[in-house]
Regions:
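Active-site neighborhoods of divalent-metal-dependent phosphate/nucleic-acid chemistry enzymes
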Residues: 73-133
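Acidic, PIN/NYN-like endoribonuclease modules and their adjacent C-terminal/linker elements
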Residues: 123-158
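Short Gly/charged-rich anion-binding patches and loops
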Residues: 23, 55, 106, 129-133, ...
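A structural signal for short, well-ordered beta-strand segments and their strand-loop junctions
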Residues: 4, 38-40, 119-120, 143-146
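PIN-domain endoribonuclease scaffold, especially VapC-family toxins
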Residues: 41, 45-97
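Short, well-structured N-terminal submotif of metal-dependent ribonuclease cores
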Residues: 1-39, 46-60
Length: 158
């Protein structure tokens, strides 16, 4: 199974202090090495602009290979997502005006094309243009879970 991580879930890793939760980081490393944990270049760009704690930031820099460049098929699927007018709101006004990275549609497309699962901390909200809403849409149909569910699927407990 491939898991495509959104910025929100990678950022949440800061709560798992490496000195206390060594097994989390060991498990994540195993998934990175097997190619099961990936993300997108756009997520990396968001992380670089964000406020990520030093450990998580260094961990991600040391594993930068997980941040894939969108394929032609993924970009075509992003275009399909945006054909649904409501989902054009995935690109917020700030991103449009300032040209800041927009990872959400690329994360979804990456998971769709690679038959993976999106991992995000965004929540399903009625009538919203959020990752879970897009994933749930009939024309998209991509599994979407949060970090806690991801860890449960790995069989991790602390």
């Amino acid at each position: 199974m491939i898991y495509v991580f959104d910025t929100s879930s990678l950022s949440k890793l800061k709560h798992f202090f490496p000195g206390v939760f060594k097994s989390v980081w060991t498990g994540l490393d195993g998934l990175v090495q097997s190619g099961e944990l990936i993300s997108t270049r756009e997520v990396w760009n968001e992380i670089e602009r964000g406020d990520v704690d030093p450990h998580t930031s260094q961990w991600l820099k040391d594993r930068k290979q997980i941040f894939t460049t969108p394929t032609a098929n993924e970009l075509r699927f992003v275009a399909q997502i945006f054909q649904i007018k409501h989902f054009q709101a995935l690109i917020g006004e700030k991103q449009r005006l300032m040209g800041t990275p927009v990872a959400d549609p690329v994360v979804i497309a990456c998971a769709k094309i690679r038959q993976g699962t999106v991992v995000t901390e965004e929540r399903l909200k009625p009538h919203a243009a959020k990752i879970p809403n897009v994933c749930q849409h009939a024309s998209v149909s991509v599994p979407c879970i949060d970090l806690e569910t991801f860890m449960q699927k790995q069989g991790w407990s602390f």
